[in-house]
C-alpha cells in the first residue's frame, strides 16, 4: 500500500499519531482540503462561532486535562482572530497547537485575498511558529509543534499551512524521537540546591508554601501535599494554582494578592521563608514589590529560568520541573526530618496560631441580604452543589474573584480562568472545551453580563452538540470591576460601564432550544441552581445581583499587600 498522501491527509495522520481526539475550529477557503479529510470523522471537529472562541475552547480542553488543545482557522481574518487566545495561552502556559491556513506559497507577500502575515504576527505570542513550505515538511512541523507545546514550560505553537501544501502530495514518513538542537530545558533540578533548600525549610520559623499554576501543569499536586504535610507549613495557592492543594486541607490559607484573603497577605508580610513552586511573583500577588515579604528568604522552583529572579531575587534558585524537583526534595526533607523536626516546634506552632488568628480576625465572609441577591450568595450556592468536585470556568471580573474566594476546589484542573491576560469572553468557550474533554463531569460557566455578551454566539455551539453546561450569568448591570475602581478611585464618576440592556434569558435560551430563567429573589437562588443542575442538558441562569457590591479585600494599585481595603468606607458622622 502506497503511503503517498495529500498534505491534508498527512496532517490528519499526524494528529492521530499525537492522539488528538477532537479539535475546535471554523473553516474557510484555504482550509477546505483539510476539512474534506476531516469529513471522514477520524478526528472530531467542533464548529464554534468565532475563531477566538476556538482557541479559548482548546484552552479549556487543555486546562482541564493537561493534554494539548487543538484549534484551526483559515487565513487572514480567521488567523488574526486567534491572536487573543494565543496570547492568553502564552501568558498562562497552556499547551495549544493552532493550525492556520495560508494563501498559496506563490501568492505570499502579494496582498492576496485573505492574506495576512500570520507567521510574523504570531512570533511574539507563541512559543514557536512554523510556516510549512511543502507537504513533505508537514510531519516534522506538526510533531515538533506538539512536542514544543507540551514540553518545558507549556505554551501555544502555531503552524501556518498554505493551501497548495494542503493540496500537494508527499510520501508520509512518520517522525521518530523529536530532537531540537538549541531547545533545551532542565527538568531535574540541581541536587545540591535541592538539599540546601530542604535544610532551609527546617531552619525556618515562619515558612509559607507559595504554589502556582506550575504545580498543576507538572502534575505535582500530590507531591505538593506531601511537602506541606511533612514540614507542616501553611500554604497559599495563586489564582492559577487553586486546587493544587485541596481547599479543605488544614494547612491551606487561601489565595493571596490583590483580592486575596487578609490572612494570606499578612502571612506573606511576616514570613521568614517563601517556598515558591511554579509561581512567578506576579504583580497581582506581590503588590508593591519593594514592600513584599520584607523578612523572607526565597526558594524558587520553576521550569523556566527566565522567571527566577525576574521579580523577586531567589536565595536558592532551582530550575526544574516542579514534579521532578519535588520528588527529590521530598526525599531529602524526609531524610533530614529526624534530626531537624523538633528544632523550631514552638515557633512553628506560634506561626500557625498567628495565621489562624488573622483568619478569624478578617474572614472571607459573604454578604447576605433578604432584599437583593448578593453576588457572594450566588457563588456560595454554586459551591454547595459543586462540593469541591465540579469544573468551574470563569470569565474575567468581579465574579472571577468571588469565585476564587468562595468556591472550594479539592483537585487540580477544576478552576479554569484567564489569569495573566484577563480576557473577557473567555469563560463560556473555555467551559465548552472542558465539557467536551470531560463529558461525565459537571461543568459551570461562571460569567458576568459583560463577558457573556462577548461570547453569546457560542450558545449555538452548546445547543448544536447538546453540551450539559450550566451557564450562570452574574448580572449586575455593569462592567463590575471597572465600576468598582471608578467608585473607589475616581470619585464615583461612572464612565462607560453601564450595561443596561440584557436579553431575556428564557427567550434567549429558548431560541437555541434549551431552558433558561432569570432569578431576582434571594430566596429562589438555591432552587434555581438545583433546577439547572438536575436538568440533563444545557441551562442558562441569569441571576440579577446587587449592582454596587465591591470585591474585598482589595489591595489598591501601588500599595503593599498588607495595605488592604477590607470593606466599604464607613460613613462619617457630621
Where are these regions (language model features)?
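Active-site diphosphate/adenylate-binding microenvironment
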Residues: 11-12, 16, 20, 26, ...
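A short, small-residue-rich loop immediately preceding and capping a beta-strand
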Residues: 21-24, 44-46, 64-103, 210-213, ...
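Glycine-rich phosphate/diphosphate-binding loops that line cofactor/substrate pockets in enzymes
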Residues: 8-20, 60-66, 90, 148-153, ...
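Thiamine diphosphate
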Residues: 99, 107, 113-114, 265, ...
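Phosphate/pyrophosphate-binding active-site segments
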Residues: 1-2, 136, 174, 295-396, ...
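Glycine-rich, anion-gripping cofactor-binding loops and their flanking helix/strand elements
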Residues: 63, 213-299, 410-440, 455-456, ...
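Conformationally flexible catalytic loops at phosphate/diphosphate-handling active centers
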Residues: 144, 148-203, 359, 364, ...
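Glycine-rich, acidic loop regions that bind phosphate or pyrophosphate groups
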Residues: 100-141, 241-350
Amino acid at each position: 500500500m502506497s503511503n503517498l498522501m495529500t498534505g491534508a491527509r498527512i496532517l490528519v495522520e499526524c494528529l492521530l499519531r499525537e492522539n488528538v481526539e477532537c479539535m475546535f475550529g471554523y473553516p474557510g477557503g484555504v482550509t477546505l482540503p483539510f476539512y474534506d479529510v476531516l469529513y471522514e470523522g477520524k478526528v472530531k471537529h467542533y464548529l464554534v462561532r468565532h475563531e477566538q472562541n476556538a482557541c479559548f475552547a482548546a484552552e479549556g480542553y487543555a486546562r482541564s486535562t493537561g493534554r494539548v488543545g487543538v484549534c484551526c482557522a483559515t487565513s487572514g481574518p480567521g488567523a488574526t482572530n486567534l491572536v487573543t487566545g494565543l496570547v492568553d495561552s502564552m501568558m498562562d502556559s497552556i499547551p495549544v497547537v493552532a493550525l492556520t491556513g495560508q494563501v498559496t506559497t506563490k501568492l505570499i507577500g502579494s496582498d492576496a485575498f485573505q492574506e495576512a502575515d500570520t507567521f510574523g504576527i504570531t512570533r511574539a505570542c507563541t512559543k514557536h511558529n512554523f510556516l510549512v513550505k511543502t507537504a513533505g515538511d508537514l510531519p516534522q512541523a506538526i510533531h515538533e509543534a506538539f512536542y514544543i507545546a507540551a514540553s518545558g514550560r507549556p505554551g501555544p505553537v502555531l503552524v501556518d499551512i498554505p493551501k497548495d501544501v494542503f493540496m500537494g502530495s508527499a510520501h508520509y514518513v512518520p517522525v521518530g524521537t523529536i530532537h531540537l538542537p538549541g531547545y533545551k530545558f532542565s527538568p531535574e533540578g540541581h541536587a545540591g540546591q535541592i538539599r540546601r533548600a530542604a535544610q532551609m525549610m527546617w531552619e525556618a520559623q515562619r515558612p509559607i508554601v507559595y504554589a502556582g499554576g506550575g504545580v498543576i501543569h507538572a502534575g505535582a499536586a500530590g507531591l505538593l501535599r506531601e511537602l506541606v504535610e511533612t514540614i507542616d507549613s501553611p500554604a497559599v495557592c495563586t489564582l492559577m494554582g487553586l486546587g493544587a492543594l485541596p481547599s479543605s486541607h488544614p494547612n491551606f490559607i487561601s489565595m493571596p494578592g490583590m483580592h486575596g484573603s487578609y490572612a494570606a497577605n499578612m502571612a506573606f508580610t511576616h514570613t521568614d521563608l517563601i517556598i515558591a513552586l511554579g509561581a512567578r511573583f506576579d504583580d497581582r500577588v506581590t503588590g508593591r514589590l519593594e514592600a513584599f515579604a520584607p523578612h523572607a528568604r526565597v526558594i524558587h522552583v520553576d521550569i523556566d529560568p527566565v522567571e527566577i529572579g525576574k521579580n523577586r531575587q531567589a536565595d536558592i534558585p532551582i530550575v526544574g520541573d516542579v514534579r521532578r524537583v519535588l520528588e527529590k526534595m521530598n526525599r531529602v526533607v524526609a531524610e533530614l526530618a529526624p534530626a531537624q523536626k523538633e528544632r523550631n516546634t514552638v515557633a512553628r506552632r506560634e506561626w500557625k496560631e498567628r495565621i489562624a488568628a488573622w483568619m478569624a480576625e478578617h474572614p472571607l465572609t459573604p454578604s447576605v441580604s433578604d432584599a437583593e441577591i448578593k453576588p457572594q450568595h450566588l457563588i456560595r450556592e454554586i459551591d454547595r452543589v459543586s462540593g469541591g468536585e465540579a469544573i468551574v470556568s470563569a470569565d474575567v471580573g468581579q465574579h472571577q474573584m468571588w469565585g476564587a474566594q468562595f468556591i472550594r476546589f479539592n483537585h487540580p484542573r477544576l478552576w479554569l480562568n484567564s489569569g495573566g491576560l484577563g480576557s473577557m469572553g473567555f469563560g463560556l468557550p473555555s467551559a465548552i472545551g472542558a465539557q467536551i474533554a470531560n463529558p461525565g463531569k459537571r461543568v459551570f460557566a461562571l460569567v458576568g453580563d459583560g463577558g457573556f455578551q462577548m461570547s453569546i454566539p457560542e450558545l449555538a455551539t452548546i445547543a448544536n452538540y447538546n453540551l450539559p453546561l450550566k451557564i450562570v450569568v452574574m448580572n449586575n448591570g455593569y462592567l463590575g470591576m471597572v465600576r468598582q475602581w471608578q467608585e473607589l478611585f475616581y470619585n464615583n464618576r461612572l464612565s462607560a460601564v453601564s450595561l443596561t440592556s440584557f436579553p431575556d434569558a428564557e427567550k434567549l435560551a429558548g431560541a437555541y432550544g434549551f431552558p433558561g430563567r432569570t432569578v431576582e429573589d434571594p430566596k429562589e437562588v438555591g432552587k434555581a441552581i438545583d433546577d439547572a443542575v438536575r436538568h440533563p442538558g444545557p441551562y442558562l441562569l441569569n441571576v440579577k445581583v446587587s449592582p454596587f457590591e465591591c470585591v474585598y479585600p482589595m489591595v489598591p494599585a501601588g500599595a503593599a499587600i498588607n495595605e488592604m481595603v477590607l470593606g466599604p468606607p464607613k460613613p462619617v458622622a457630621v
